[in-house]
Amino acid sequence: MAELPKYVLEPLRRGDRFYVRSKRLAKLRLLFLLLLGSCIFAPPMHSQIAQEETLGGPDSHETGQGPHGHLFGEWAGERSRLLERGVKFDFQYVSDSLWNIKSDKKERFASWNRFRWTVDVDFGELVGQRDLFFHATALWQGGGNLGAYLGLLTSPSGMSSMNTTRLDSWWLEKRWLDEKITARIGQFAGQDFYGAQHYAASFIFEPMGYALGNLFTDFESFDPPSTPAMEVRVVPLHNFYVKSMVEAEDRDPFAHNPTGLVPQFRGGPVSISEIGFTPGKKATTLRAFDTVESRKGYSGLYQFGASYNPGKFTTASGVSQSGDYLLYWMASQAIWRVDPKGAKGLDATFAYDWNPPDINRNNTMLTAGLRFNEPLPLPIHNTMSLGYVQNRLSQQFVPPGAPRWKPEHAIEFNALLDPLPMLLLQPVIQYYANVGAKTGRALVFGFRTKVEF
């Protein structure tokens, strides 16, 4: 049985069923890594691609920071001088402060806090090695997990997981032919780029504020405990892309690599692929998460993806078998604009995923949402978003004599406000029905705070 991780539902210890890689597979993987590495450092072709956003979900930047976008300022101009050389530093704090103001459990305040340090390097600007980039990010995070306390399938926070201080991800990225071909190798999470919600920064609860919540079932990696990975992306047509990655499976990543500094190969290779259609935008310019600048005009993103893990899994009947997979469909579209070339207006998003109900208890999820960009007549950036999540458990895993599971429903409304260039506030209210696929309701209120240092 494949379930969500221990910090979402319950402890998941299956060391005795880890998929064991053969020596032949290990040699092939090492050979592929060496070949890809040699391609990354091949002589560059000319391009003038600027640095762009490399963080996603709650850590992404809705707007550019600009000259007054940091609490500590420009370091006497040193930040700008480094950026001119292709080196960008980012230090931020994000917190979700949430209360269950009504539920079957006693009222509780839970605050999840995260400090993140990030460096991005454009070697074209730094040493003349064009189209070669480096990214690394580390964090400290900790606090209370309200979703685990309430027994929810849908986590109220897109950040909460485990208390940790660690290197999250790093990679080297090489681009050819004006980004028509891109290769990346390093340590990064599948859920940062596959099954990730394009409008994630506009929502708080996890399935819409980061990535689809049951991508964990076949052990697609997530941040911050990213695993070794490699990816290739190809853009054969103006509005169409194909990308695929292979990552190392790890069924208990926080325990096996607590610092993130020692690459771990604890299971088989998990493969993830996606095709995408990008009406209104060049596929080469599109990233996993949108920004205020990228949402201008009637742009959209339509995705179909699949992940496959060849490891050992246990079915609902207790039989061990090899292989598990997940399919997902996602759509994000600007449906109305005040100015056809502007960002003010209404966006819609929809996503659905499925994997075999005889292997996966958390086997299907549906999300849908609306976002109104700049609804308030204010000089600051603001949005209002309404989201819905339906979480279903496979009836094949209902314990004998227990009642059938019900679909858990979650609704969220939030407003995002940018009162200062370095400060973001996002008050939110959430309602949950059939908590934990059983009975019961919960009402959660709180806010997200983000500070750029």
What are these model-derived regions, one by one?
Residues 43-96, 100, 106, 127:
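N-terminal periplasmic/intermembrane-space "pro-region" immediately following the signal or transit peptide
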Residues 255-261, 274-278, 305-321, 325, ...:
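Outer membrane beta-barrel transmembrane domains
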Residues 89-97, 134-140, 183-187, 242-248, ...:
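Transmembrane beta-barrel strands of outer-membrane/channel proteins
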Residues 73-89, 122-134, 177-180, 239, ...:
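Short loop/turn motifs that connect adjacent beta-strands in outer-membrane beta-barrel proteins
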Residues 441-453:
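Outer-membrane beta-barrel "beta-signal"
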Residues 146-171, 178-271, 396:
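Surface-exposed coil loops of outer-membrane beta-barrel proteins
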Residues 117, 170, 183, 230, ...:
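Membrane-embedded beta-strands of outer-membrane beta-barrel proteins
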